[in-house]
Amino acid sequence: MSSGNISNLPARRPFMRRRKVCPFSGENAPAIDFKDPKLLLRYMSERGKIVPSRITAVSAKKQRELARAIKRARQLALLPYVVD
């Protein structure tokens, strides 16, 4: 293939990434509560660390609430600090 012959290649469409929406905003969104370990475990890694908001698409305000709830649940032994 010659290096100067690019005119006959099909044009690529740019990849449009879908905007993520915060799962805690909206009318029927779940409330962040430290007494709900099932909900909080969805936002923790398999090693027990809090997953960052750029991965979970949680807004900054709700990420702070989520981190606070996870830390409270850890203190009350509802969630583990680390998982081996």
Swiss-Prot record:
It comes from the Bacteria. One of its GO terms (cellular component) is cytosolic small ribosomal subunit. The keyword Phosphoprotein does not apply. GO terms for molecular function: small ribosomal subunit rRNA binding; structural constituent of ribosome. InterPro entries: Ribosomal_bS18 (IPR001648), Ribosomal_bS18_CS (IPR018275), Ribosomal_bS18_sf (IPR036870). GO terms for biological process: translation. SUPFAM superfamilies: Ribosomal protein S18 (SSF46911). It holds the Pfam family Ribosomal_S18. Keywords: Ribonucleoprotein, Ribosomal protein, RNA-binding, rRNA-binding. Part of the 30S ribosomal subunit. Forms a tight heterodimer with protein bS6. Belongs to the bacterial ribosomal protein bS18 family. Binds as a heterodimer with protein bS6 to the central domain of the 16S rRNA, where it helps stabilize the platform of the 30S subunit. NCBIfam families: S18. HAMAP family: Ribosomal_bS18 (MF_00270). This is Small ribosomal subunit protein bS18. It comes from Maricaulis maris (strain MCS10). The gene is rpsR.
